[in-house]
């Protein structure tokens, strides 16, 4: 029984070790990742038990550093002190918000960190020696690490300053945090030197490093005031353009008002100047303006009057030849009336033919120009053809009379043309007639083809009926002709007759 129990204990212990190993591995990985986030190289020597304190310090310092402006430069010594001291949890700073006016005066953020008086006394004793060293640390981080290391070696015997390490480092970690990161090389070098030295040397170096940022925060205060003014100028810059726009608008309005006022005053002054002039001058100017207008108007009227006088005789001349065609139109109207009346009697149109064309010829010789004769001769054939088409049922005298009237009068030409156009068919009617004629022709051609085909078929039927009926041998009996031929073919192919 002892062997199984020992085996169970060993297996149980082995399982516990297996469970503890991943937990420790995860804890180490978390600390390594947090060290990488803070920008510090991992260290796996005697500083490993301090990782939890370092992580808590880094998180608390990051929370407090968010309250500080990003433009404030960070001292490298505060970065080292923040990474090395693990007993700073004992002292907690008191955050008291300041007013905006005080923050603008002191150049700090709205968080003030109160410290115990003991640490301030210890730090004030070292202030004079650390001013020059802090100025160097602001310029070169490597020089700060080397100086801090050398000073730490000198201040090894400082057991009394062990008490002031905690609050001083806490103050530096809270007040001197900004967007700038210190180089991790100095921190690593200081930690390597402390690993070879006792803890008193480590504490004294931390005191030395933590006491320096007190004045580093005071020295950037002057620079931070300038930066504060620059940062405060940002919202002022945002508000100033609005004020400047207003001022610009106001000034432009004032300028416009001033210009309008100046224009008004100028116009008023001009009016006063004109009013200050004597009245006879204004009268003379008005007279000088009136006189040329009178002269110009009279000359224009005189010039236009003869133009109108010249134009009137031309219009009279133009109206004279137009008056004569009106007379012809009246006469032609009478002639057309008589033509319609001549359909009943044949004697009256003969009398009108001899009288009215004579009058028309006399008028032509007197008034109508030569181009009218040409136009009449051009329209003779067309009008005569139209009248001949429309008046097919008239007598020879009636058909001859419109031709003489067209020879005589141009008005008669227009009247006859109008009558011919009215009697003519429209285009769509002509198209329809042509289409109907084509369709009728096609129908006739189709009928002719059908008749011819029917006659041929009938002829074939008659020929078939006239042929004699076939004999019974031809209908397919045993002695029919095709069977005989088949027998002969078989004999010729299979049996060749031999000679006798």
Curated annotation (Swiss-Prot):
**Ranges of compositional bias, category Polar residues:** 76-89, 159-178, 279-289, 298-324
Q: How does it sit in the membrane?
A: Single-pass type I membrane protein
Q: Which InterPro entries match?
A: MUCL3
Q: Which UniProt keywords apply?
A: Cell membrane, Cytoplasm, Glycoprotein, Membrane, Signal, Transmembrane, Transmembrane helix
Q: Where is the signal peptide?
A: 1-27
Region (Disordered) location: 55-198, 275-324
All ranges on the Extracellular side of the membrane: 28-429
Q: Which GO terms describe its cellular component?
A: cytoplasm; plasma membrane
- Respond yes or no to whether keyword Transmembrane is given for this record: yes
Where is composition skewed (Basic and acidic residues) in this entry? Answer: 58-71, 111-123, 132-142
* Residue intervals on the Cytoplasmic side: 451-500
Localization of this protein: Cell membrane; Cytoplasm
Glycosylation: residue positions: 108, 148
Give a short account of what the protein does.
May modulate NF-kappaB signaling and play a role in cell growth.
Supply the name of the protein: Mucin-like protein 3
Give the originating organism: Mus musculus
What gene makes this protein?
A: Mucl3
């Amino acid at each position: 029984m002892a062997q199984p129990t020992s085996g169970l204990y060993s297996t149980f212990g082995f399982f516990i070790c297996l469970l503890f190993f991943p937990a420790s591995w995860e804890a180490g990985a978390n600390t390594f990742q947090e060290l990488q986030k803070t920008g510090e190289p991992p260290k796996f020597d005697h500083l490993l038990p301090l990782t939890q304190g370092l992580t808590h310090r880094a998180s608390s310092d990051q929370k407090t550093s968010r309250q500080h402006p990003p433009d404030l430069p960070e001292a490298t010594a505060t970065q080292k002190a923040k990474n090395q001291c693990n007993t700073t949890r004992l002292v907690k700073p008191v955050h008291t918000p300041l007013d905006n006016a005080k923050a603008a005066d002191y150049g700090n953020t709205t968080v003030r960190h109160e410290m115990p008086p003991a640490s301030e006394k210890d730090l004030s004793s070292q202030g004079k020696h650390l001013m020059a060293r802090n100025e160097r640390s602001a310029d070169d981080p490597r020089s700060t690490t080397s100086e801090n290391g050398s000073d730490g070696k000198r201040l090894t015997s400082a057991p009394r300053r062990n008490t002031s390490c905690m609050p001083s480092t806490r103050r530096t970690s809270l007040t001197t945090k900004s967007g700038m990161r210190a180089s991790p090389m100095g921190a690593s070098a200081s930690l390597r030197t402390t690993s070879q030295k006792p803890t008193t040397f480590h504490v004294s170096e931390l005191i030395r490093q933590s006491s320096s940022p007190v004045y580093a925060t005071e020295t950037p205060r002057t620079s931070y005031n300038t930066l504060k003014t620059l940062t405060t100028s940002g919202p002022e810059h945002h508000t100033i353009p609005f004020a400047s726009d207003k001022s610009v608008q106001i000034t432009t309005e004032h300028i416009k008002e001033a210009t309008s006022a100046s224009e008004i005053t100028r116009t008023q002054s001009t009016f006063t100047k004109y009013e200050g002039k004597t009245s006879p001058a204004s009268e003379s100017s008005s007279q000088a303006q009136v006189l040329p207008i009178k002269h110009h108007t009279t000359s224009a009227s005189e010039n236009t009057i003869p133009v109108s006088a010249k134009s009137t005789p031309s219009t009279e001349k133009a109206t004279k030849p137009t008056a004569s065609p009106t007379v012809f139109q009246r006469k032609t109207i009478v002639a057309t009336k008589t033509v319609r009346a001549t359909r009943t009697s044949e004697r009256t149109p003969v009398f009108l033919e001899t009288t009215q064309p004579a009058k028309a010829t006399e008028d032509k010789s007197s008034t109508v120009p030569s181009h009218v004769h040409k136009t009449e001769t051009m329209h003779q054939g067309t009008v005569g053809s139209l009248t001949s088409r429309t008046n097919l049922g008239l007598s020879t005298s009636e058909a001859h009379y419109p031709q003489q009237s067209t020879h005589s009068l141009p008005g008669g030409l227009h009247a006859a043309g109008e009558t011919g156009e009215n009697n003519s068919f429209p285009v769509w009617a002509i198209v329809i007639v042509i289409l109907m004629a084509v369709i009728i022709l096609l129908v006739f051609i189709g009928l002719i083809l059908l008749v011819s085909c029917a006659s041929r078929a009938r002829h074939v039927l008659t020929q078939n009926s006239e042929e004699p009926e076939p004999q019974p041998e031809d209908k397919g009996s045993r002695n029919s002709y095709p069977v005989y031929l088949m027998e002969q073919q078989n004999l010729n192919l299979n049996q060749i007759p031999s000679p006798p």
